Amino acid sequence: MLGKALKVATFGLCAVLPLAAHANNFNYNMMEFRMGTSPGTFGGEVTTYFTENTHFIGRADSEFSGDWDIAGGIGFNGPAGQFADIYGQMLVHNIKKDSGDLVGDEWKTEVNIGTRVWFMQNIELHGRIGQLIDNDDSKTSYNLGARFHSTQQLSLGADLKDNGTYGQQLVLSARFAY
């Protein structure tokens, strides 16, 4: 009797919670241009698919006063339901402060994880948390924001972020999908 009830419960659970595979809900082939406030920074980011669920990342930010934060690495992405994606990234940063060196002063690694969710039609909410790892001084990085997708190729966003280098900023961005 218990075996029959277990089989019925398992069948019912499988019928209610289908384990169908979904494609990614967001495009990870994109180019972004951004401007941050307090301190004023300009930056950009490019991501492109390596496989269906992995992508390469390259990003750079600067105050244009002899400084930069350049990062590159690889990330994963995949669906977390019908309207959301989960993603993560492993990056290597080269950070240059105001010194005269040709190459940046510091090399750091970053590991992060985040999610992107369709809140309404053409409105995306996203969040990411990570760690900028240094032997002496590791820092938490985060990004919370919203993005309006005006077309399939163009979206405009506003984020509250701290990338671990420039501190807390309000960032406005334009993203172009390809």
Feature names for model-found ranges:
Residues 48, 76-78, 115-117, 148, ...:
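Residue-level signature of outer-membrane beta-barrel architecture
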Residues 31-37, 58-62, 88-94, 127-131, ...:
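Transmembrane beta-barrel strands of outer-membrane/channel proteins
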Residues 38-42, 66-70, 105-111, 138-142, ...:
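Residues that define the transmembrane beta-barrel architecture of outer-membrane proteins
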Residues 39, 64-66, 80, 94-100, ...:
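Gram-negative outer-membrane beta-barrel proteins
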Residues 1-27:
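Cleavable N-terminal export/targeting peptides
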Residues 72-74, 142-155, 167-178:
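Outer-membrane beta-barrel "beta-signal"
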